[in-house]
């Protein structure tokens, strides 16, 4: 295994853990799309505190995960 693969596995596990932590918070957070809940994506929500931090962290991790995936795909 290359170092980039290990980093991607760790990031994927972190994203899953954060998604599971956010899944009990409303219908817009976490893994709501997988559980069949109604998604209210364009509704304004006032998330504060740890929920907001987890949402931003998950967004950043997913973007980095996609970038690393593209780099890994085109590098080999």
From Swiss-Prot:
Q: Which UniProt keywords are present, listed alphabetically?
A: Cell membrane, Membrane, Protein transport, Translocation, Transmembrane, Transmembrane helix, Transport
Transmembrane stretches, start-end: 3-23, 56-76
Main localization of the protein described in the UniProt heading: membrane
Keyword Membrane tagged: yes
* One GO MF term attached to the UniProt entry: protein-transporting ATPase activity
Leader sequence range is none
Q: What is this protein called?
A: Probable protein-export membrane protein SecG
Per the UniProt entry, what species is this protein from, by scientific name?
A: Mycoplasma pneumoniae (strain ATCC 29342 / M129 / Subtype 1) (Mycoplasmoides pneumoniae)
